[in-house]
A protein has these predicted regions:
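A glycine-/polar-enriched beta->alpha junction
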Residues: 30-38, 47-62, 96-114, 124-131, ...
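Periplasmic alpha-helical coiled-coil/stalk elements that build and connect Gram-negative outer-membrane
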Residues: 132-247, 359, 363, 404-405, ...
């Protein structure tokens, strides 16, 4: 078992990334911007929707086309009167051009507006994906740091219990303690070994989670500088104020509002199917032909034909089998759907924003409590070990105090990371999160040794 554990820990400490990667949060985020599939898909969708604008605009512009044709042939004919065969050769050349343009198609202008609004909505979705990436990268990064901290604490706890186990065995050998104390210490040591294995595996899991986002394995990531770490009450300092900020700036909410505009214009576009349309058209066609025959009864000729036309076409829809009315009803139902989506998004934004604010405030208090808990646990362990030396405390008391100390350290470590994550979640809900937040957090890291 010791050999297996050593192999696992060695793999953790000596693993190298498949691709070279910088080891701080900012570099990991930049790598994620280039490789995260969610962001790249949102970017691609935005590019797709932008082209809809060009396609919708194109039908409003003149449509010009040109044609050309050439044919060459030969015809043989037999005359029973003259008992002779004659041959006629002919060829023709034709070309033309046409210009068509919509003078009035109300639905075409509405479709252009819908395309613009849809592209704007897609752009907002892309921005949302990038905001979410900040949160996801930071969460994955600090989950990995937390796993590494847990391994350090597990190894330190195991080492402390190993010393206590050895001390208990020595005391038992000279008759100063009972065999039950040895068993208690051995059981705690075995638990510590199990926790070390679990912590080591958690690092592998966290590395894989980060790799999914960045497409490279992390290596020697920078740690949180606990000496410089400090907490700050969110500004503004009330849940109501953050709710107002979110209602004005949250991109999910803004996206849903644009969806309402798109749905309304879709109704107008469907109704435009009842409107008349007016089109302009102009065309020119020319053809030249030549016929040459050896039959004296047939004359060779060189016909030329030119054709010009220009005009407007008015189309007034009278009855389309109910298709237009159906399209209007469908668009109206889609508007109801978009309205409900906006309402649900607003409720979710209010809930997540207020919860995020309260969570940040609670986490700040939690950090202060865990800092005091670590100090108290350290003093308690010292006192318990001193009592054990003089016989007033048992090895069970020492083991419990040891476990309490490292539990407090784990809780403090994880709560610090949770504070950073909760602040980002609050800013994400409030619509104020930016790349600068990554830079600010990165400045609070220290290069891994």
């Amino acid at each position: 078992m010791k050999k297996t554990l050593s192999t696992l820990i060695l793999a953790i400490t000596s693993a190298v990334s498949i691709n070279a990667q910088a080891d701080d949060l900012l570099s990991v985020y930049q790598q994620a911007l280039l490789n995260d599939t969610i962001v790249l898909k949102a970017q691609a969708q935005f590019s797709i929707d932008k082209e809809d604008i060009e396609q919708a605009r194109s039908v409003l512009l003149p449509q010009i086309s040109a044609t050309a044709s050439y044919s060459d042939g030969e015809q043989e004919s037999y005359s029973s009167l003259t008992d002779s065969t004659s041959t006629a050769e002919f060829n023709s050349l034709g070309y033309g051009a046409s210009l068509n343009m919509q003078l009035y198609h109300h639905d075409s202008w509405l479709r252009l507006d819908i395309a613009k609004k849809s592209a704007h909505q897609s752009d907002l979705t892309y921005q949302v994906a990038k905001q979410d990436l900040i949160v996801r990268v930071t969460e994955a990064y600090f989950t990995l740091l937390s796993a590494k901290d847990d391994l350090v604490f597990a190894q330190a706890e195991k080492a402390a219990i190993a010393r206590q186990l050895e001390q208990t065995k020595q005391r038992f050998s000279v008759g100063l303690t009972a065999i039950t104390d040895v068993h208690e210490a051995q059981a705690q040591y075995d638990n510590a070994v199990t926790e070390e294995i679990r912590s080591a595996n958690a690092i592998f899991t966290a590395e894989e989670a980060l790799r999914v986002i960045t497409n490279v394995y992390p290596r020697n990531i920078s740690a949180l500088n606990t000496d410089r770490f400090s907490t700050t009450t969110p500004t503004p300092n009330s849940a109501d104020a953050w709710q107002k900020t979110a209602e004005a700036k949250n991109l999910d909410l803004i996206t849903a509002k644009v969806g309402i505009d798109v749905a309304q214009q879709t109704i107008n576009s469907a109704r435009a199917g009842h409107y008349p349309t007016l089109d302009f058209g102009a065309s020119y066609n020319s053809s030249d032909g030549e016929t040459d025959s050896d039959n004296p009864l047939l004359t060779s000729n060189d016909p030329r034909l030119n054709d010009y036309s220009i005009g407007v076409t008015l189309n007034v829809p009278i009855y389309s089998g109910g298709a237009i009315q159906s399209s209007v009803r469908q668009a109206q139902s889609n508007f109801v759907l978009a309205s409900q989506d906006l309402m649900q998004t607003h409720r979710d934004v209010v809930r997540t924003t207020r919860n995020a604010y309260n969570t940040v405030v609670a986490t700040i208090s939690g950090i202060k409590a865990f800092e005091q808990s670590v100090l108290s646990a350290e003093k308690a362990l010292e006192a318990t070990e001193a009592g054990f030396e003089v016989g007033t405390r048992t090895i069970v008391d020492v083991l419990d105090s040891t476990r309490n100390l490292y539990d407090a350290k784990r809780n403090l470590s994880s709560t610090r990371y949770a504070y950073i994550q909760n602040v980002l979640s609050l800013k994400r809900s409030g619509g104020t999160i930016t790349d600068e937040d990554i830079t600010a957090i990165n400045s609070g890291l220290v290069t891994a040794q």
